[in-house]
Amino acid sequence: MSKNRMKKFVSILLALTMTVLCFVPAAAAEPKDKVTPILIIAGFGEYVLVDGDGNQVWGPSQDAIVETAKNAIAPLGAFLKGDYETFCTGIVEIANNLFEPVSCNPDGTAKHPDVTVIDQYTEPVSQYGLDEVTRGDVFDKDIVDACCDEVGADNVYVYGLTWHKSMQELAADINTYVQKIKADKHVDKVSIAGHSMGGAVLASYLGLYGCDDVSNITMLNSAFTGLDMVGCLFKGEIAVGIDKLIPFINQSMNSDTLGKVLDTLKLLQLAVPKLEGFLETELPDGSGRTYKDRIYTECLVSGFGYTPSLWAFVPDEYYDDAKAVMKAYMEKNQQQSGVSASVIAANWATFERKIDEIHDIQANISSILQRAKASGTSVCIFSNYNLYIAPFTPTADYTSDGVIETNRTSGGATCARLKMTLGDDYVQARDVGHNCLSEDGIIDASTCMLPENTWFIKNYGHSMFDYRKNGCDLYVRAMTAKTQPTVDTWAEYPQFLVYNAGTHYVAPLTAKFGDVDLDGSITPVDSRLALRYVNGMEELSPTAKYVADANRSGDISTFDAE
């Protein structure tokens, strides 16, 4: 072949090669570790809700709270005088005015469809800026910041709950988000994390749409199995735990000042028995019904009972009894409004279909998550414990994250009652191949739906995402994991952890100060590692930094290495 022909041949070959390469899918040129976008579903009340004119209707504005407090003075005065009828009429009116903008009709539809979150961010955080997306009246959580640092603000999305919409509507919104993210980012899957009620929405989405579009499922103190407290309330079980009320107030206020005042004056000891007596007092109409029945019928049913999404908070073992109790109150509520029996029946049929569909998902969530894992989707569950919950039901002594009971957020852990242990003779309930008992004797994780993929953090609040140190690190690792993590995946983050409010660190429950290499014992090796870190010769993990600060000064120095 002549040189000219060879040149022509090579030129044609190169041209053909370039032509073929033009048609090779773009994915072939993408990096193997392409970032998977993250969608965070916020919890109940994390976004302010506004009406069609932009007026804040939930959470209550400062002005609304002040007005409510002023309006409550007269009814409270009547209560102290023993005038229960005036007191009940007053508080029912106050509560109904407060909840009316976010209430639902007896068939489960919103009374005011124009009420929605103050802002819904349909684009990634980068389009608005972190300060905008985490401002006070929306999702003001450091977890967004942590995710942005890990995968870039262009790959993080946040969904705010218009929580009085049905779970079916909320799940449909999530599906719309997921499809948009996939199209915009040219990805096959999205990592989804659900916080609090957002976890119940995530569960509903998985039950209705499956997990084919989901790379990672992360439950963050999630209500995906309900709340014992709500189950009790929907069954009509109210009980104020005086001994738990002051600790709960102190915990909520992050101070014991108010608790000390209340305890010294014995105000709660005087007020609570009187309140319980009021609830059980029969109405003066001779019906045999009590003031508790009246409050449920005229207030709680319209404020919460008709809201189908809140029924996702009723755990499976409470559900049938709760339906029977609330149905009776709902019927009475509508009868008092002059609604005919046929319309009442039609309303219930429509409402029941909505709540039953979502309840069936909750009742089968273990199987749903197991199937997700089997299909290659990573599933991680995070549950906090050792905090008081609102003490207004018989389950007030359940350990919790301050809002939801730990046995619920963990998907079934066996938990000791608050400030107690399971006992020295307690034996792990199930053999799952490794120890599932917390070193403090409070938790048995073997009874969880996914004991291999469930972590517990002691003393960490329901909505705490403390990013000052490593308080978001484990969560972000789970959201971005390329394969299924287990409680053995990260040595610095075993199954049982503890949050230190003074240092802002999350560390193993068994962590020993000075044990820098985390091998369970303190040796000269630990001193050497601390010195190397001080001299800039060694990098330490967040947990190692936590234990290296042996003298708790807030900084690692040569004194810690001594």
What are these regions (language model features)?
Residues 1-5:
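N-terminal secretory signal peptides that target proteins for export/translocation
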Residues 6-27:
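Sec-dependent N-terminal signal peptides of Gram-positive bacterial secreted proteins and lipoproteins
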Residues 23-29, 509-562:
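Cellulosome-associated attachment modules in secreted, modular CAZymes
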Residues 136, 163, 167-170, 372-375, ...:
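Aromatic-acidic/polar surface patches that form glycan- and anion
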Residues 140, 258, 291-292, 322-323, ...:
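Short amphipathic alpha-helical segments that mediate assembly, nucleic-acid/protein binding
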Residues 154-161, 165-168, 294-398, 420, ...:
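Alpha/beta-hydrolase fold catalytic core
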Residues 168, 172-346:
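Serine-dependent carboxylesterase/thioesterase catalytic core
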